[in-house]
C-alpha cells in the first residue's frame, strides 16, 4: 500500500480497506492461506500501512526529495542477469539516492540479501551517485 498511496494518514479507514481489498487476489487464495477472510486481511493491511505512515523516519525520507515507487530494473551482477522491483527510490540530494524496501513480519536473512542485490543494481544504474539502501519493517500492535 505504501507504493500505491504514499503517506496518506488523512484517508478514512473504510476507504483504505476498500483499496486494500482491490489489491488482493480475487480468488481469496491469500486469505485462505492464512485462515482469514479477505476483509480481515484488508484490515490487517490497513493497520500495517497506518503504522508505516506513522513512522517519523519514513516520513522524513519521503519529504527528502522526489520519489519513484515500484521501480523495475534489470542488471547484470557478477555475470548473472537480475530482475527486480525496488519498492521506493528517493532522490535525497544531488547525486544521492536512497532505496527503501518495505517488509512486514520479522527480519529474515533473505531480506538483507535482496536489499544488497538492489543496492548493487542501483549503483550500476546510477553511476556517480551515492546510494543508500534501507529495509523498513512495518510494525503494528498485535501484528507480526
What are these regions (language model features)?
Residues 1-78, 139, 144:
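A non-catalytic, helix-rich entry segment at domain boundaries
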Residues 10, 81, 112, 130-131:
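Short linear functional motifs in flexible/disordered or boundary regions
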Residues 37, 107, 120-144:
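Metal-dependent nuclease catalytic regions and adjoining charged, substrate-binding loops involved
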Residues 65, 94-96, 129:
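Short coil/turn segments at beta-strand junctions that form active-site/ligand-binding loops
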Residues 77-116, 120, 124-125:
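Non-catalytic protein-protein interaction segments used by genome-maintenance enzymes to assemble
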